[in-house]
Amino acid sequence: MCKSKCVSLQPEFEQNPQKIVMITSFTAENYRSIDGEIRLSFKADTGIKDMDNRGYTTVANTHVLNAKAFFGANSSGKSNVFKAVGMMRGIIIHSVRLNDNETLPYDAFLLSDEEARPTRFEISFVDGTDKFTYGFSYTAQRIEEEWLIVKFPKRSLKTLLRRTPDLIEIDAQNYPEGLSIKDGTIPLNNNRLFISLAAQLGGEISKRVIEWFRTKPNVISGLQDNDFSHYTKEMLHTRADYKDEILYFIGSMDVGFREVITQQEYIDEKLLPKGLPAEIVASLKEHPPIVAYAKHEKINADGEVMGVVDFDIDERESDGTRKLFNLAGPIVDTLRQGKSLFVDELDAQLHPLLSRRIVTLFNCAETNPHGAQLIFTTHDTNMLSKKLLRRDQVVFVEKTVRTHYSTKLTPMMSIKFDNGSKPRTDSNYEKNYLEGKYGAIPYFEDEFEGCNE
């Protein structure tokens, strides 16, 4: 299946060898609708053979999934799982800028009688042959705990850092960059992450962790994809090495055009609204907006091409086409650089076949040679197909009285029916899900049987 369909999707995508870097797990606790600990595993279950095209990349002797799909009712907390990833990333990246009197972005579960309980995040990833696990817990006022665990080739697992409110422990032999912070030579504020300070001081291991968070994971809302419009436009305008791949991606989706031209607008201060803050004016002049035009063929009654008309993509294209255009830059960049892309509501405004095509790009080794990952939420039950997703790539999300209105994750691989059986390879996953056999669907108090009742 993969070899017959995937090679033709992106024949010009770069195949340069590079180090594979992938997320293997993520854990969150006490964040928004998440009360108790939830854990996402991206390790593949190699015992299942659901698809011909594998759907995973082998790195550091670990089989890691290239895609993961989250299904669940509205208000189940799917978005909050992705926001947790974004929050962890944001705290790490911005920790270096915090003054000692600033608070941390604490957004705990509100339906618990345990007040001021720390929020906790942890992520594990493989970076080439090295394995990292990093996490921390915090309240609005301080970092409560912090830990860094690594596994280098032919060496045992090492806990390099363990921080509590009363104690900081480091592995001096394997993590000497932390010594000056531990002994107090370099002061560490209560609201600042240890590895952030260590990286600022030049610590090589800490810099690797910070750089991974800065460059590899990216979280996008499929309902607010306009934020990434400039991302795609700038790539088309300034990155000739990306332009062909982005245009091929767009053209392969059958949206009515294959060519896009970009133009940087001239900013005339005289035409700007009066009273606009000086910093905004300066920013507009330094980074003028880029306009993208789709080139549409003009056809006569005989089907002959009579010319080309330029459509301003933001003004004249449909919502779905604009979304696909906005996502094109992040998707191509993720595939090319082997990053991890989290997309909330991937299917919103897209035809089901377009969503499936995007997932297939990540699941096929031919179009995803660098171990890129696509993690997404969706309401499109057509994706619950064994031809598209492996069973270990599917997670169901629910929030009910049984879960005390806290978000709960149930991987399809962990589902057990009353008779002790599990979902079979030959099951109709979509039908079973809509019938409630896997949970994570809306339940109505009354059956609606007709419009006359």
Positions of predicted regions on the chain:
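Short, positively charged and aromatic/hydrophobic N-terminal segments
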Residues: K3, S8-Q10, Q18
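Pre-Walker A-like glycine/lysine-rich segment at the N-terminus of P-loop NTPase domains
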Residues: F13-M87
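C-terminal lobe/lid and adjacent interdomain/linker elements of RecA-like ASCE P-loop ATPase modules
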Residues: P17-S25, R357-E453
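Extended helical coiled-coil dimerization/tether regions that scaffold
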Residues: E29, F228-R316, Y429, K437-Y438, ...
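Conserved Walker B
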Residues: Y31, E345-L350, T381
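Conserved P-loop NTP-binding catalytic core
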Residues: G55-A69, A73, F82-Y134, T139-I143
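Conserved ABC ATPase signature
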Residues: A67-N74, A278-V332, S340, L346-L353
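Electropositive, glycine-dotted interaction segments
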Residues: T133-L271
